[in-house]
Regions:
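Catalytic phosphate/nucleotide-handling subdomain of diverse soluble enzymes
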Residues: 48, 55, 59-67, 180-183, ...
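Acidic, carboxylate-rich catalytic segments that either coordinate divalent cations
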Residues: 222, 229-259, 312-408
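Bacterial N-terminal signal peptides
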Residues: 8-18
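Active-site-surrounding "flap" and adjacent substrate/cofactor-binding loops of secreted or lumenal enzymes
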Residues: 50-87, 102-120
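Accessory "access/gating" subregions that flank catalytic or transport cores
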Residues: 26, 31, 127, 136-145, ...
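Mature N-terminal segment immediately following signal peptide/propeptide cleavage
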Residues: 23-49
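Mature, well-folded catalytic/scaffold domains that follow N-terminal targeting or propeptide regions
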Residues: 35-36, 88, 105, 133-137, ...
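Extracytoplasmic mature domains of secreted/periplasmic and thylakoid-lumen proteins
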Residues: 97-152, 157-160
């Protein structure tokens, strides 16, 4: 046994050396286990917070507003738009590959039949009118350009990109620009970046810092993240004090409300995600409860916070009450996926991402698959200012493309 372990270690070192730059490794089995945990966290967060959604705006919800968790609640997630919308993007990637262009992504989104709101609804309406992306998200055509929408849907981008933050950015530019602009896109890239890091990191501050590295540092969203980190370092116990600080600056101060989407704005809701993720102390229930009690979009916010946390913890470290009752045969609304097939497609895409980002997939001496992933720093694009945007590009679908948009 000792000789086998030694050979495995030598093989791993040789593969790392062959990569040249520093690399991180994760077994395929551990990747899958953490990715499953991330989806469980998303589902648990959204269903637990759902009864409070937008009922508490600018006030802290009482603890009594949240039900006690019972295992069967996990099956309330199959009809949640917070989950099935991002599965449209997963299906597009699986069908057309990682190099799918934004126009095709827009056609697929335009053809969806589920009900949408805010930036998602405006973006899809624009697409159906023939306004091709990225113009479909431009503030000239979309009054909700800085709303929370892509932040809600970006979980998939990190779950299929373990340790690959640049791929998270590219997926954000591909799908986030269908409906969001500027900070509206950056919120999703930030969340996706946290997921990508959570496969390798348990320190919550470092996970947040990894997400922060994925977005333009001069953006308002980045300023909000730095504020939340500062307030956490100043007082990691009093989440209600941090909530009051976030509300005062990121919801009530007019200097930070330029082209704001109000209570659905990505920045105040991103602050509530971090409220739960940081002040929750790494505890699943505390994380969800705090993020939900922060109010505003209080099902989406605990979903994002719990999804990242559960990915970091891994399935083995999550209380079984969150997943033992999951119906594995039921399909998510408007999708072809039940839970096992969702996990299967995400694992398939993750393998492609690892290779596309310059990584390798090898077997050790025991036949166990190992993902070897180069540590490449993300390179965010320039800052798109939503209240002073560049001119629309004049993107329009051709008549042939419009003929492929069947929904009206």
């Amino acid at each position: 046994m000792g000789m086998i372990l030694k050979r495995a270690a030598v093989l791993a070192l040789a593969m790392l050396a062959a990569m040249g730059a520093s690399a991180r490794t994760i077994s395929a089995a551990e990747y899958k286990e953490r990715m499953i945990a991330g989806w469980i966290g998303q589902i648990a967060g959204v269903v637990w917070g759902a009864p409070t959604e937008f009922k508490f705006k600018g006030v802290i919800a009482p603890d009594s507003a949240l039900r006690e968790w019972v295992p069967s609640m996990i099956n309330e997630g199959f009809d949640q738009d917070d989950l099935y919308v991002e599965m449209t993007f997963i299906e597009t990637l699986d069908k057309y590959g990682l190099t799918v262009d934004i126009r095709q992504a827009g056609i697929d989104f335009a053809n969806t039949r589920y009900k949408l709101w805010c930036a998602n609804a405006a973006g899809r309406t624009n697409l159906r009118k023939g306004i091709a992306p990225p113009d479909s998200s431009h503030p000239a055509f979309n009054r909700y350009a800085t709303a929370i929408d892509y932040q809600i849907e970006a979980d998939f981008s990190g779950l299929i990109s373990p340790g690959c933050p640049q791929r998270v950015l590219e997926l954000g530019n591909l799908f986030g620009r269908l409906m969001n602009y500027g900070d509206g896109v950056y919120g999703g890239q930030f969340v996706g970046g946290m997921y990508a890091e959570a496969f390798f990191e348990t320190n919550r501050v470092r996970i947040v810092e990894a997400g922060l590295a994925c977005i333009p540092q001069e953006s308002l969203y980045a300023q909000m993240v730095r504020d939340m980190l500062k307030w956490y370092r100043n007082d990691p116990k009093d989440w209600k004090l941090a909530w009051r600080c976030a509300k005062a600056k990121w919801r009530e101060n007019s200097d930070y409300q330029k082209l704001s989407s109000g209570d659905i704005d990505v920045k105040i809701n991103g602050a509530m995600v971090l409220l739960g993720f940081l002040w929750g102390g790494g505890d699943p229930e505390n994380t969800i409860r705090i993020a939900a009690r922060g109010g505003y979009d209080s099902d989406c916010n605990p979903s994002s916070a719990a999804g990242v946390l559960f990915t970091s913890l891994g399935l083995k470290n999550i209380p079984a009450k969150y997943y033992t009752a999951l119906d594995r045969s039921k399909k998510f609304s408007f999708t072809a996926y039940d839970f096992p097939s969702l996990i299967e497609v995400c694992e398939r895409l993750a393998r492609k991402v690892v290779l596309k980002e310059g990584g390798k997939i090898r077997k050790d001496s025991n036949g166990k698959e190992i993902f070897i992933i180069p540590q490449n720093a993300p390179a965010p694009d320039g800052y798109d200012i939503a209240w002073a945007p560049v001119r629309p590009e004049g993107c329009r679908y051709t008549s042939e493309e419009r003929a492929r948009i069947r929904a009206k």
